[in-house]
């Protein structure tokens, strides 16, 4: 069995902590069994490891998130497949399946499980995946989905409606799918025994390759990736699940949450405050996450979520936190992330100014982890000035190599090739 983890998202749902490169699944806000901070994706992969399935993971993600995946999951040695462009879940799954077929040389009868990288769930979830695999092995259906037993007639999820029959059966044929219904219809669907669509699919590799080869039939994974734009921009549900002639569902009744809103996330945070925060005794149902170095004091607040980062500040009534996305549109699309993690380390933007003469100055604080490096590169339109503030490293500037230490200042002019490797953790402004 192979697992494809889908990692996407635009980073808007938990703004200002999340952004285009640091989507919600990468926020280290949860607590591991050892008491350490962990992200949603780290939690899921840890659970997969505990289920004995670690060696089978391939993460399908965008190029902008690849470094974050490598940083957070590097210790697990997962494979990473990057989309050349974002084109929804069907192309992403097709590309990852092509990787399994053409790079990992998996057989057509290899069973593949596709799942999101960020469900907040428990061990029984992975036992249900095992049941899905068993259903595919026994040819109960070509495509098997996980259905989450609903806790309310929610309009936030799609629904899977099983065929009439034995509702207690472990595997049920699917009658139809309903996409995010209004509450009245959702209540009717619950009466019919409908399940939330958990976005988890199981199938044989040959099943999906026959489908994606209708669009891109190429001898190598490299060519499939090069022709990625030929895949339709459509979800896996629409392109495959809803058109499947042989589809079944296995239900899961344990803990399952989508931590995609501030209201949902705060219910699972290990404490009411994270960061430099003072919350007075009169504060009621208030959660504060402060990523800034500045102190934040809350007095007499009620039913609020407050979050601060270098990207902005959010103060929201918890019941209205789901409305965040429509307000973000007012900020425009030209804002850049103020914090990013890369394969070599991380950086934070600490100042950005444009002078009257048009000159722009961007100031960053970089941390390059010991043994990592920024690759040999050249800039055609800007100059850089590096000040080493802590640690030691090896600099290559226009082919000349030298060691650098705290206090060294390096002026990198246009058209000069440069690279730097950290001997110890290296901090640069």
Regions found by a protein language model. Give the residues of each.
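Residue-level signal for inorganic ion chemistry
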Residues: 41, 96, 118, 160, ...
